[in-house]
A protein has these predicted regions:
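Catalytic glycan-binding domains that act on GlcNAc-containing polysaccharides
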Residues: 6-157
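N-terminal Sec-pathway targeting helices
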Residues: 1-3
């Protein structure tokens, strides 16, 4: 039993804790959700770059980073871990204001805001805006994975 618990602590670290706590509080985002996104996106590898060009801990696309920097009025660098976290946490906060449900927020983080808005318009959401189906298999798996890690972080810490 103890070995299993230790395994989860090793698999679900709280790296960058000070920075994640600070920006999560600033932008009103659940820190455990941020850890789950970072764990899923990059496994806490600051130098991660996806085949599609997403960069850093939170795997932010350069075009999204540009939008975030313009909106915040700040000059931030995707390759600097603290800046990447600031952008990603702000972006989650932005998506939380657009969508009422965490699954929709996560789907938009993964597939894009416009894509999820299209799904909602095309009947993939219930009356309260919750996604009833996610047409992209990759995004469906992503949302499940982040939710799994999110629940694990909530239980462990």
């Amino acid at each position: 039993m103890i070995a299993a618990i230790l395994f989860f602590y090793v698999m679900l670290p709280k790296k960058y804790e000070r920075v994640i706590q600070e920006f999560s509080q600033e932008f009103g985002v659940d820190g455990d959700l941020v850890y789950a996104v970072v764990r899923t996106e990059s496994n806490f590898r600051a130098d991660a770059v996806s085949r599609r060009g997403a960069v850093g801990l939170m795997q932010i696309m350069p075009s999204t980073a540009e939008f975030i920097c313009q909106t915040l009025g700040e000059k931030l660098d995707l390759n600097v871990p603290e800046d990447n976290l600031r952008m990603g946490i702000w972006y989650i906060s932005y998506l939380e204001k657009k969508f009422d449900h965490t699954d929709a927020v996560l789907a938009a983080y993964n597939a894009g805001e416009g894509t999820v808005l299209g799904w909602i318009r095309n009947g993939y959401a219930g009356e309260k805006g919750e996604l009833t189906d996610i047409p992209y298999q990759e995004t469906k798996i992503y949302v499940r994975k982040v939710n799994f890690f999110y629940n694990c972080y909530k239980m462990l810490y």
